[in-house]
Design a protein with these regions (language model features):
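TPR-adjacent "capping" and linker segments in tetratricopeptide-repeat scaffold/adaptor proteins
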Residues: 1-5, 109-114
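Alpha-helical segment of the N-proximal tetratricopeptide repeat
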Residues: 2-28, 32
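Structural signature of tandem alpha-helical TPR/SEL1-like repeats
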Residues: 15-27, 50-62, 84-96, 101
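Short, charge-rich amphipathic alpha-helical segments embedded
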Residues: 28-50
Length: 115
């Protein structure tokens, strides 16, 4: 099976609330590609749903290293920090997410407005 197959399998397990099976599938995907951003994000979110916030933070940090321009990755990590009660860290990471969002908006072509 490919990393995408394991990721999709993990998503199916997650949807069925089989979180341990989802974690196992995401880890298999990451065995194929340690920087597979979709699997890292899904794994972090699954850990958060299991209330394993320390693991969610650890994987969230890996996700940001793997996908440094992904504003959703920063937003998720900020939420994990909030869940842990690390408000200063959450605010710092949330600011980075906002900055990435602004950069994205500024780089998008402007569509002319009709009068």
């Amino acid at each position: 099976m490919s990393k995408e197959d394991f990721y999709n399998q993990g998503m199916e397990h997650f949807a069925q609330d089989r979180l341990d099976d989802a974690v196992a599938a995401y880890l298999r995907a990451l065995d194929d590609d340690a920087n597979y951003a979709d699997a890292l994000h899904a794994l972090a979110m699954t850990y958060a749903h299991q209330e394993k916030v320390d693991q969610a933070i650890e994987i969230g940090k890996r996700l940001i290293e793997a996908a440094p321009e992904d504003e959703l990755a920063y937003t998720s990590l900020s939420i994990f920090y909030q869940q842990k009660g690390l408000i200063a860290e959450a605010e710092e990471i949330a600011a980075k997410a906002r900055t990435l969002g602004w950069k994205r908006q500024l780089s998008e072509p402007k569509t002319p407005t009709k009068s």
